[in-house]
Amino acid sequence: NYFISNYPQYSFWQPEHVPQLISLLNSPPQDEPIPLGIYFHIPFCRKRCHFCYFRVYTDKNASEIKAYIDSGIKEIERYGQMPYLKGRKPKFIYFGGGTPSYLSVAQLTELTDRMKAVFPWDEAEEVAFECEPGTLTEKKLDRIRKLGVTRLSLGVENFNDHILEINGRAHRSKENIRSYNYAKVIGF
């Protein structure tokens, strides 16, 4: 058995595929284009869970996180200028990780404002956002909702504190319940 820790797998990409991809992106859609989805990866966490096999970073400061966000936005802006994607509105947005809710309210606002400037998602069917309950405050959940997020994945994993502890989770059951209850209050 093996796990996929990067998607698509590195073995998927072959040098001979690059010209075809560039050609597609540099051409306007011929027919009804395939619905557009955007995944933005946030590889930061408060701590590494014992079962996690993904590349995550637990020791990054605000300036390093800003540099990562800036690089991701630069890539989005580049793709947003390509004829195949220019002017399109995504059908779905997914913020995965790591832990997207690790970002501060200011970082989340900057990230999403800059993304929406390139790919507005006011008509998206779903905007999904992964969380770790211990990183959520009412202020942050309110902001996440106002940013247009329609679905939360709370990352509860378990309600037994002993199991959470032995799995290396940073949160405990009371944070699961608090986050869930407030998310329901504000319409998730």
Regions found by a protein language model. Give the residues of each.
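Residue-level signal for beta-strand positions within conserved beta-sheet cores that form or flank
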Residues: I34, C52, E123-E125
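Conserved non-cysteine loop/helix-boundary elements of the Radical SAM core domain that shape
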Residues: V56-Y84, P90-F188
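Local cysteine-cluster metal-coordination motifs and their immediate loop/turn environment
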Residues: F40-V56
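Proline-rich low-complexity regions
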Residues: P8-Y10, P43, P100, P133
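Flexible, acidic/Gly-rich N-terminal and inter-domain linker regions that tether
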Residues: N1-L36, R46, K86
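Structural motif
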Residues: L36-G37, F92
